[in-house]
Structure formats: C-alpha cells, structure tokens
Amino acid sequence: MIVKNKLHKDVLAWEIEVEDLNIDVKNLDYKLQDGSLFKKITTRFENHNQDLKNKILNKLDIDYIKKQIPEYKEIDIKIFKDIPGFKLWPHLDRKDHKGFIVINLIDNKDSTEFLDFDEKFLAKSSNKKNKGVFHILWKKPYCLHAIENTSNKNRYTTIAFIK
C-alpha cells in the first residue's frame, strides 16, 4: 500500500494505492449484508471468502497503520458489491472503528465524499481501480463521509475497518 496526498486540510484522509489485487469481483458469491454494520440497507451485498480477505490484508501497510493509529486492535476486511441505488447518507462511523481504508476493486463511477458538519463538500476519494482512501476516525478535525452508487452498474470495493 502506498500512501499519497492528503485529500483536504480539514480531513484526516489520504489517497492510497495498492498493487492489483486481481480479484474477479463480478464472479464472486455475494449475500445481502447482515445489518451488523448498516441496518436496513438492502442495496449492499458482501462476499465472505476468507482467502480473499487475507489476500487484501496482506497488501496493507500494517506498520503505517500502527504508526497512524497505535491503539488499533484488529482490521476487519469486507468485500462489497453496492448495486445501483445504494446510498449511505453523510455519517460518522461507530466509535469502535478507529479508521478505514476503502479500495476500489474496479473503476467505479462514485467514491467516498467527505463533508463538514453542515454537509458542505470538502473532498472526494479516488474512484479508480486499486486506488482509494485511508481515513482516520474520531480525531480532530472531525468530518462526515458518504457514498452513493449513482451509476447503473454495480460498485465493487473492499473496506478495511480498523478497530
């Protein structure tokens, strides 16, 4: 994982890039996400293949994560398919999440947006394959983030939730 530019002076988020994961996302088995992270959302599906999750985890720069979030205990990898119409409104993540890394598994139309507490746009992460964002949560300056799939195609990402 290569950490690049900070997205905005008021957002603790940096563009990242990883080697090609070579995951055939369109042919994976997905199940409707179970609601443990996102209640009442019926437009996000999850793949539970542990070998793929380990492959993704091995591409992350754990030393860099430890340096930025020394109190972290674990990294929970999720592989998502967001169908057209998927939307997470501007929000803060759960308190047990210290940060996250989103990686696009294909070129997606939409990507994570960061907003202030008046929901004014601040920055947007990359939507390109093998690129994404590393965001530190619960440290100042605080901000909201949101995502929506406005395309007519599925959006494929992996998210490493740093706890």
Identify the role of each PLM range.
Residues 1-71:
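Non-heme Fe(II)/2-oxoglutarate
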Residues 21, 70-73, 140, 151-153:
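Exposed regions on extracellular, virion, or secretory-pathway luminal proteins
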Residues 26-27, 31-33, 37-51, 55, ...:
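N-acyltransferase acceptor-side catalytic subdomain
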Residues 52-53, 72-78, 129-134:
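N-terminal start-of-chain detector that recognizes signal peptides
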Residues 63-99, 103-117:
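Non-heme Fe(II) oxygenase catalytic core, chiefly the N-lobe of the double-stranded beta-helix
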Residues 85-86, 95-97, 107-163:
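Catalytic core of Fe(II)/2-oxoglutarate
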